[in-house]
Design a protein with these regions (language model features):
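Beta-strand-rich domains and repeat architectures in extracellular enzymes and scaffolds
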Residues: 177-206
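Intrinsically disordered terminal extensions that flank WD40 beta-propeller domains
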Residues: 2-185, 484
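Loop/turn-rich, solvent-exposed surfaces of beta-rich toroidal or solenoidal domains
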Residues: 370-375, 379-387, 394, 402-437
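Conserved strand-to-loop turn within each blade of WD40 beta-propeller repeats
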Residues: 202-205, 248-251, 290-293, 333-336, ...
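Canonical WD40 repeat/beta-propeller blade segments in eukaryotic WD-repeat proteins
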Residues: 183-190, 230-237, 272-280, 315-322, ...
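Per-blade loop-tip surfaces of WD-repeat and WD-like beta-propellers in eukaryotic adaptors/scaffolds
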Residues: 169-171, 207-223, 240-242, 249-276, ...
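C-terminal interaction modules of eukaryotic adaptor/scaffold proteins
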Residues: 432-484
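Loop/turn segments within WD40 beta-propeller blades
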Residues: 189-196, 236-242, 248, 278-284, ...
């Protein structure tokens, strides 16, 4: 077959290709390109690296854990956690020097709050000017003298033994509000003086603060000491020697403030926390205090050491109280969910059996006898107040009350007024609920625009109707009074 004849265009194209090839050959372009290409490939081969991933370790398969409660597994809960979180628990502050003041305008000094195994001078632990400490000592001695002269028995106005009415006459005046100490208040007491209004509080930092409500000079009437290095859990004022006062703390110390000696004497020291203290009205030489896991000790002031120790509860005792008409009858409340009534004449070291026990679903923060001793009121974290009546306190009435204060507010503790008619307890709406024992319900709430925080701990003046002190977790104290 004859070859196909090329067109003019194809012949011209082939001639151009041939001519270009000759030009490139004369310039040695192809050899140069080949050399460069070979060099580049060689360089890439030398520098190219590969990241080798390490072999992954084969993890063993973790078993799937199904969380089940102790109750569903039939296991008894730990006694330390059975009552929930510890009431008023707070970490002990560092035992180093720290500056604490009761008000922004008050000059303060640094106080060493370390544990002193011995007496402490009031002057050394005073938070403020030394001249103010001297003034407080003089004030306290005058308060004590007034208490001894008045006798301190019964209510003013001949109201003793009668039902006290007129709660609507109670009011909170603007001048009866003060920030006494910094931080949360755990304990509050009104001095049993008929001629002077004095309130003492203890806070979580180990401060003991005094408020002279009737102070009229340039001072604010507030005096703060730091005899302890941990939360002050209890205060007992001697009824006929108000210049003497016991305080206890979570660090296991009990101190006796003696204003005449101007000292905080060390009455007792132990390894366990002390949660509450109390004293019988007819025995000023003995002090009852709860320590550690349900232990109740009796401190003898004549020997300066404990004389008896009883294991009454499974875990901490939150309150101790005596029947005013029969001081052999004692009531205790505990985080184990019970409140018990004891006859001290029948309690022995190896066998402590309660006369009566009332059970709650959660921790019981308080159990107090009424002024006549015929009713026992308990306050529990299970949102209830129980009233025990009858010859053997066998009749139990339950009143619902919201007692959930949360972590930052001290637990509510219902206290008695000046007769058996009412129980006073704080609420979460910045008021004070009044519980009627006759109607078994809240019949009134004390409110005031002066209340800026939740009052949670209370005490009443034993001889003045209508005088109620309420303390907050911010260091404030409110003092209600009656116009009648």
């Amino acid at each position: 077959m004859a070859p196909k004849k090329l067109t003019d265009y194809e012949r011209k194209r082939l001639d151009n290709i041939k001519r270009n090839a000759e030009v490139l050959a004369s310039l040695k372009i192809h050899s140069t390109l080949n050399d460069l290409s070979s060099s580049a490939k060689s360089q890439r081969a030398k520098t190219k690296s590969y990241k080798v991933s390490p072999k992954k370790k084969v993890k063993g398969e973790s078993p799937i854990v199904i969380r089940r409660s102790l109750r569903s597994r039939g296991i008894k809960p730990d006694e330390l956690s059975a009552g929930g979180l510890k009431d008023d628990y707070t970490e002990t502050p560092n035992k180093k020097a720290k500056t604490i003041g009761s008000s922004p305008n008050k000059k303060v000094k640094t106080v060493d709050s370390s544990r002193e195994l011995g007496p402490i001078s009031m002057r050394d632990v005073y938070v403020g000017k030394e001249s103010e400490d001297r003034k407080f000592v003089e004030t306290m001695l005058n308060v004590s003298k007034g208490s001894r002269d008045s006798g301190g028995d019964g209510l003013e106005g001949g109201c003793e033994g009668k039902e006290i009415k007129g709660l609507d006459t109670m009011s909170l005046e603007e001048g009866n509000v003060a920030r006494v100490v910094p931080g949360r208040i755990l304990s509050v007491r009104v001095f049993p003086s008929v001629d002077r209004r004095m309130v003492v509080v203890g806070n979580k930092f180990g401060n003991v603060g005094f408020w002279n409500v009737d102070c009229v000079d340039e001072s604010d009437g507030i005096y703060v000491y730091q005899p302890h290095s941990s939360p002050v859990s209890g205060i007992v004022v001697q009824p006929f020697s108000t210049f003497k006062m016991f305080t206890c703390c979570y660090d296991g110390f009990i101190r006796l403030m003696d204003v005449e000696k101007e000292m905080f004497d060390l009455a007792y020291s132990g390894a366990d926390s002390i949660y509450s203290i109390a004293q019988r009205a007819d025995d000023v030489n003995s002090l009852y205090f709860s320590e550690g896991r349900g232990e109740l000790n009796i401190w003898d002031g004549r020997t300066g050491k404990p004389s008896s120790s009883w294991g009454l509860h499974e875990t901490r005792i939150n309150s101790i109280h005596f029947n005013a008409c029969n001081t052999n009858m004692m009531a205790t409340s505990s985080s184990d969910g019970t409140a018990c009534i004891w006859d001290l004449r029948k309690v022995v070291a190896d066998k402590a059996e309660a006369l009566n026990t009332v059970n709650h679903e959660r921790a019981v923060h308080a159990a107090y006898f009424s002024p006549s001793g015929s009713i026992l009121a308990t306050t529990s974290l299970d949102d209830s107040i129980k009233l025990l009546t009858g010859a053997n306190y066998e009749n139990v009435s339950k009143i619902h009350h919201n007692n959930q204060t949360g972590r930052w507010i001290s637990s509510f503790k219902g206290i008695w007024g000046w007769d058996d008619s009412h129980v006073f307890i704080g609420n979460m709406k910045r008021g004070v609920d009044v519980i009627s024992t006759a109607e078994k319900r809240c019949i009134d709430t004390l409110v005031s625009p002066e209340i800026t925080a939740i009052p949670c701990r209370f005490d009443v003046h034993p001889h003045k109707f209508g005088m109620l002190a309420g303390a907050t977790s911010g260091g404030q104290v409110y003092l209600w009074t009656s116009s009648c």
